[in-house]
A protein has these predicted regions:
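Conserved catalytic-core segment of clan PA serine endopeptidases
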Residues: 31-38, 105-168
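C-terminal subregion of chymotrypsin/trypsin-like serine protease catalytic domains
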Residues: 26-57, 83-99, 202-325
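N-terminal carbohydrate-binding/catalytic regions of secreted carbohydrate-active enzymes
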Residues: 55-90, 94-108
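Short conserved beta-strand and strand-loop elements enriched in small hydrophobics
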Residues: 101-117, 172-180, 249
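Bacterial N-terminal signal peptides that target proteins for export
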Residues: 2-11
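Cleavable N-terminal signal peptides
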Residues: 12-13, 23-24
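Chymotrypsin/trypsin-fold serine protease catalytic domain
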Residues: 141, 145-241, 263-268
Length: 325
């Protein structure tokens, strides 16, 4: 079975999503109210940040279990509104390098109310991962730098370990969730799919599948959206248009959510498997160190600011030099 790499090149994706009858789709189960997945992604209703023990019922009104029993509800404000990246530094995001169709991201609130502000941030450097002796992982990964600091969200920390098998430990990592805005479908009890929406109209979210294979730098999650798993009652599978969409994991020992990886590929027609690139903290640290190099020249003990009336000035006799690459 061929594995597909999801490429959200927006113009091409729009044409494909509207003309092809066999394109792949985002997958959730039709047996529970679709609003669960919408609210989960927007931190609305029962799914406000920090909420726990959230009851889930099916469309018959029957209880099918409780979400977020072992972790507080995550705050999804770190995810871009198009769902293809997450904020991991004051002005850095993480996604996959084959996402060449986006030049910026938005962060902020949803809705048309004037108080629901959101702002766009242009990408000024893509920082695509390059494989060499000191960078041993797959190249389909990047940490773009934004034009300015993001003020609508605080960045989320990355997982510290690149060994994928680490994250199958349900005692230490009891919960995983994912979010995205790829083309939206539901699957019925007979495993037939039905279209709900095209891509990039809104985000949906839920718990991930369980971990299958793993190696250094990647993890594969597999399952069936019709069946709850150990993570919860709202499994969701990523698909076409979801490349770069983030997966998060709860570290019970540290008591906080971390970004675990970004979606790279899978079998979206069946909605049964997704492969993620593990978040690379060392790579981000390397990028930041290269972008910001500060040098102080201590020549005098005084610091006097003198304006020249022309929009510039001089500060004493020692300097501060940020280096921009």
């Amino acid at each position: 079975m061929q594995k597909t790499t999801f490429k959200p090149k927006f113009i091409a994706a729009f044409v494909a999503l509207n003309l092809s009858p066999m394109v792949f789709a985002g997958q959730v189960y039709s047996g529970v109210d679709y609003q669960y997945f919408r609210d989960f992604a927007e931190n609305k209703g029962k799914f406000t940040p920090g909420a726990q023990n959230i009851a889930v019922v099916n469309k018959k009104g029957e209880s099918i279990g409780t979400m977020m029993q072992n972790a507080p509800m995550i705050d999804f404000s770190v995810v871009s509104r198009n769902g293809v990246a997450a904020l991991v530094g004051d002005q850095y995001i993480v996604s996959v390098a084959h996402n060449v169709g986006y030049s910026g991201v938005d962060f902020g609130m949803e809705g048309s109310n004037p108080d629901q502000h959101r702002f766009g941030y242009n990408i000024v450097k893509r920082n695509n991962y390059k494989n060499d002796p000191t960078h041993p992982y797959m190249t389909d990964y990047h940490n773009p730098r934004l034009a300015k600091f993001v003020t609508e969200a605080a960045p989320i920390e990355m997982v510290p370990n690149m060994h994928g098998s680490t994250y199958s430990d349900l005692e230490k990592y009891p919960m995983r969730v994912r979010i995205g805005s790829g083309r939206q479908f539901v699957r019925d009890d007979q495993d037939n799919y039905h279209e709900i929406s095209g891509a990039y109209n809104y985000r949906t979210a839920g718990n991930t599948f369980m971990q299958g294979w793993a190696n250094n730098g990647e993890v594969s999650l597999s399952g069936d959206v019709r069946h709850p798993n150990q993570y919860g009652q709202l499994p969701i599978s990523g698909s076409s248009g979801d490349s770069g969409s983030p997966m998060f994991i709860y570290d019970k020992t540290a008591g906080k959510w971390l970004i675990n990886g970004v979606l790279r590929s899978g079998h979206p027609y069946q909605g049964k498997e997704n492969t993620y690139q593990i978040a690379r903290k060392n790579y981000l640290d390397e990028i930041i160190a290269g972008d910001l190099l500060t040098v102080f020249d201590f020549i005098a003990a005084s610091y006097d600011w003198t304006a020249d009336g022309k929009g510039s000035g001089r500060a004493g006799t020692y300097g501060f030099y940020p280096r921009e690459k």
